[in-house]
Amino acid sequence: MAAAAAAAAAATNGTGGSSGMEVDAAVVPSVMASGVTGSVSVALHPLVILNISDHWIRMRSQEGRPVQVIGALIGKQEGRNIEVMNSFELLSHTVEEKIIIDKEYYYTKEEQFKQVFKELEFLGWYTTGGPPDPSDIHVHKQVCEIIESPLFLKLNPMTKHTDLPVSVFESVIDIINGEATMLFAELTYTLATEEAERIGVDHVARMTATGSGENSTVAEHLIAQHSAIKMLHSRVKLILEYVKASEAGEVPFNHEILREAYALCHCLPVLSTDKFKTDFYDQCNDVGLMAYLGTITKTCNTMNQFVNKFNVLYDRQGIGRRMRGLFF
């Protein structure tokens, strides 16, 4: 994610960029079309790259190894101009070493996104890995059942190049050995950023460039607070150990030190006032309410999925009963 964010930030300073993941001789010839010019113009937002990087890093942390992730691309299309603005994750499973997309999950997520982003539409899909291969063709054919002429974006998180490791493709049909074969044609793209995206990407790039956050005001403030709290903890621990040792007779009493410790304790704010209790209980109630609402939302989502599956099963059984009624 660091490399992708830094490269995206660098690319936003220019007028545009083409794909950084070059297709070389290692690509299987049967999946790439040669001499084909792209039919659409693609504008890619950095938010999509950050989402894909975050998706891949989370799955790698969960699995303990690099894994391939799959998701959907959403945005706007006006004629031959396509703007990829956001993305969301997709579920998939492997059957006989072939990736199968969970279309039911996709339709659920699409409905949810339509409620929030009514102006955005499904444009294609993304995955991670090296150059395109036949397995990508297999997944692309499944996406073609959902939308006609989808885009295919591939990010290589393991690359060591300084260019943006992202390539965008479209599918074309070519006649090979007398048979119609689906191939990929690489598209050039530009990076389109909004002000909020530009600020966020610049912040991430600054944080990841040095690894210490020296250029981030927020990071410097948090580091200073952490150092102060750590020092306070060590000093309080030292005073507590001295008082315990004095009570146990391990060290002689020093009345001056004990008076200073006593005065320090009395400098602490009184936390037993009615106003503090009221504010404290209000904050606890707010936190508990937020957690409760999150649980309710999750439960509603689970119930919604259950109802959808029940309706699908009920419709299938109803069709079966009607078909049997035609023959008996």
Curated annotation (Swiss-Prot):
Subcellular location(s) per record: Cytoplasm; Nucleus
Entries under InterPro entries matching the protein: EIF3F/CSN6-like_C (IPR024969), JAMM/MPN+_dom (IPR000555), MPN (IPR037518), MPN_CSN6 (IPR033859)
Gene3D superfamilies in the cross-refs: Cytidine Deaminase, domain 2
GO molecular function, one term: metallopeptidase activity
Keyword Hydrolase among record annotations: no
GO cellular component: COP9 signalosome; cytoplasm
UniProt domain MPN: residue ranges: 42-175
Statement: the UniProt record of this protein carries the keyword Methyltransferase: no
CDD domains, sorted: MPN_CSN6
Listed Pfam families: JAB, MitMem_reg
GO biological process: protein deneddylation
Keywords: Cytoplasm, Nucleus, Signalosome
Task of the protein: Component of the COP9 signalosome complex (CSN), a complex involved in various cellular and developmental processes. The CSN complex is an essential regulator of the ubiquitin (Ubl) conjugation pathway by mediating the deneddylation of the cullin subunits of SCF-type E3 ligase complexes, leading to decrease the Ubl ligase activity of SCF-type complexes such as SCF, CSA or DDB2. The complex is also involved in phosphorylation of p53/TP53, c-jun/JUN, IkappaBalpha/NFKBIA, ITPK1 and IRF8, possibly via its association with CK2 and PKD kinases.
Family according to the record: Belongs to the peptidase M67A family. CSN6 subfamily.
Subunit and interaction comment: Component of the CSN complex, composed of COPS1/GPS1, COPS2, COPS3, COPS4, COPS5, COPS6, COPS7 (COPS7A or COPS7B), COPS8 and COPS9. In the complex, it probably interacts directly with COPS2, COPS4, COPS5, COPS7 (COPS7A or COPS7B) and COPS9. Interacts with the translation initiation factor EIF3S6. Interacts weakly with RBX1. Directly interacts with COP1 and 14-3-3 protein sigma/SFN. Interacts with ERCC6.
Entry protein name: COP9 signalosome complex subunit 6
